[in-house]
Amino acid sequence: MEIQILPLIIVVAYLVGMLVVGAVVSKVQIKNAKDYMVAGRRMGLFMVAFSLSANNIGGGCTTGLAQKAFGDWGVSAVWYVLAASIAMIPLSYFAPKIRKTMAVTIPEVVGRRFGKFSSNFTAILSVLSLFCLTSSQIAASGGVINALIPSIPLNVCLIFAGVVIILYTTMGGMIADQISDLLQFGIILVGLAIATPIVLNHAGGWNAISAALPGEKLNLTQIGWASIIGYIFNYFCTFLAGPEMVSRFETAKDERTARNASFLSAILMAAMSIFPTLLGLAAFALRDQLPGLAVGGSNAMMIVTGHYAPGVVTGLISAAIICATMSSADSNLLCMSTMIINDLYTGLGGKKKLTDKQTIFCTRACNVLSAVVAILISLANVSIVAMNTFAFGIRCAGPFAAYGLGLAVPKATKNSGVVSIICGTVAFVVWQIVGGGGTWMFLMPVVAGCLVSTVSFYVVNWIEWARGVEPAPSAYLSDDEVTKKIAEESAGR
């Protein structure tokens, strides 16, 4: 009973601590709208790197990774997170460019280069996807809480998770989000680093575990090179055009910090890929000694750590995983509300220029309203996998080239951005329908959409360069505009 009660106490204390952090940050650190939306653009290397990592590490990359290792993937499950680590390396090329824009959102940059239609279309796609992602993360958070406390109905757990997310995000904004990311990722990584050797030792060491495993479970490329490469491209595409990742680079104190944070995040995620994989394999080897272990190993990581590791370690890991899942939800929620106010309000006809106080108030109001809708969607029992697959694809397949290549190709024309957004989005939808959400013609839907977006971007540019069409305006501000923007963002501090 101790193993069940102690984690519960730690989880409750942890959630209360999150709310306290949000309240303190709201009172002490939030002085203007940029503090709330992009943490005042003053975050250091570790804050940015840990926040980038935490946004990709929740239940799916911890308990889900252990489940894959327990199942058919075996040791090759490590690629599920290691692929994300590898994808962060080319992202380091774009990171300083993202920070250099001095923007708040992706639609803002797309609009600077390719006009209002491109900005509005990108914002609508992003907001639609972020609604789905917020709903799925609330559902996942409620599911983790329900797994820890089965006596509480799932719907109650969903509502509880949603309320905590609303309060925390609404109070603390991006600063509180990054503080929690640092703590949560650190606790998960350290907790698993402590628990894994303990579990392996109880199992008789790695030699004993490997001897108890079928040969295919020890094949590092069991899932196949096509899947491994596909995952790397999939992560890169969703990271480069992902609002929650881009917003982290925008919070960096300078361009060098943004680039180095990408490299450090790659190292952190690579380390994180190892421990859940080993725990999943250990659970499979010890499955006859683990009462309560699900047939498919969905609870493999928590069961094996709960059985062998100290209760304090299990409790901290449980709390951090729940809160990391919630952190993904509040990141999506904050990005969504920021786009509604920063991009759609002005882009769709908002006449009144909002003051800093009005911007913060309206963004917080959007947080509450959007989260309530997301909670209702999560209560409808829509498939989390289906929501995530649709959301990740629809938000980045179209804008991928317009945003990413818009930063890197100075001579890009306006039409190249517009056409690439439309073509990439249509290609994703077609691939999603024809392939049934899976791989078709060796390509995942999101990768296919990004590929079509990129090809159409360059084809239009080559045609218009030959015709002498003028380049679109720059994605970057002039020196005078940068000076003015810094002054505006410093006002009120």
PLM feature segments, named:
Residues 1-493:
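Membrane-embedded helix-loop-helix hairpins and adjacent transmembrane boundary segments
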